[in-house]
UniProtKB/Swiss-Prot annotation:
Shows cytolytic activity on many different cells by forming pore in lipid membranes. In vivo, increases heart rate or kills the animal by cardiac arrest. In addition, it binds to heparin with high affinity, interacts with Kv channel-interacting protein 1 (KCNIP1) in a calcium-independent manner, and binds to integrin alpha-V/beta-3 (ITGAV/ITGB3) with moderate affinity. It comes from the Eukaryota. Keywords: Cardiotoxin, Cytolysis, Disulfide bond, Membrane, Secreted, Target cell membrane, Target membrane, Toxin. InterPro entries: Cytotoxin_Cobra (IPR003572), Snake_3FTx (IPR003571), Snake_toxin-like_sf (IPR045860), Snake_toxin_con_site (IPR018354), Toxin_cobra-type (IPR054131). This is Cytotoxin 7. It holds the Pfam family Toxin_cobra-type. One of its GO terms (molecular function) is toxin activity. Belongs to the three-finger toxin family. Short-chain subfamily. Type IA cytotoxin sub-subfamily. GO terms for cellular component: extracellular region; membrane; other organism cell membrane. Expressed by the venom gland.
Length: 60
């Protein structure tokens, strides 16, 4: 699995066990990702931060 880094088109190959791509962004600024990368479990959203997770190549 390959996930985008913070600035596409750059990407990295995920290590074993991290089989989700994720994008983290502030609720107030959904078009500006704060973090991107590989993760093993999608974190829960909070009042300020949201996560978008997916399990296909470079979908974040």
């Amino acid at each position: 699995l390959k996930c985008h880094k913070l600035v596409p088109p750059f990407w990295k190959t995920c290590p074993e066990g991290k089989n989700l791509c994720y994008k983290m962004y502030m609720v107030a600024t959904p078009m500006l990702p704060v973090k991107r990368g590989c993760i093993n479990v999608c974190p829960k959203d909070s009042a300020l931060v949201k996560y978008m997770c997916c399990n296909t190549n470079k979908c974040n």
